[in-house]
């Protein structure tokens, strides 16, 4: 099955050469997602909970556009700028994954815009019937 580019309706234009998601063989690969509005400005500066919620809602939109749900998520790569925000980020993260949690890792690093506190990249296995 050839890969499909996944661009949800109303998605912002990426600030680099990538797409929000790619579907291949029933797997959705969601690009690193930052707390950006449609004009690529950081939303909710200084608020790790609101930024995390925005990021996960954006990821959900990509996965749903591909035909999946957040229950299909199998792996998340989480990048945070400060460990002091770890508990707040996890609080919101747990709301999006209330049952069995996907595998993940979390590292502290700098992000492309200094006001961004969190970035998440995701893999979801939606199966052969999924697709945009």
Curated annotation (Swiss-Prot):
Role description: Involved in pyrimidine catabolism. Catalyzes the deamination of 3-aminoacrylate to malonic semialdehyde, a reaction that can also occur spontaneously. RutC may facilitate the reaction and modulate the metabolic fitness, rather than catalyzing essential functions.
Provide the protein name: 3-aminoacrylate deaminase RutC
Q: Which Gene3D superfamilies match?
A: RutC-like
Q: Which example biological process does GO assign this protein?
A: uracil catabolic process
Which PANTHER family does this entry report, sorted A to Z?
2-IMINOBUTANOATE/2-IMINOPROPANOATE DEAMINASE RIDA, PROTEIN HMF1-RELATED
The regions listed as transmembrane in this protein's record are: none
Q: Which reaction does it catalyse?
A: (Z)-3-aminoacrylate + H2O + H(+) = 3-oxopropanoate + NH4(+)
* Phylogenetic placement of the source organism: Bacteria, Pseudomonadati, Pseudomonadota, Gammaproteobacteria, Enterobacterales
Q: Which InterPro entries match?
A: RidA_CS (IPR019897), RutC (IPR019898), RutC-like_sf (IPR035959), YjgF/YER057c/UK114 (IPR006175)
Asked whether the keyword Hydrolase is assigned, the reply is yes
Protein keywords = Hydrolase
Give its E.C. classification number.
Answer: 3.5.-.-
HAMAP family the record matches: RutC
Q: Does the keyword section mention Nucleotide-binding?
A: no
The record ties this protein, via NCBIfam families, to: RutC (TIGR03610)
Gene Ontology CC terms: cytosol
Looking at its record, which EC class is this enzyme? hydrolase
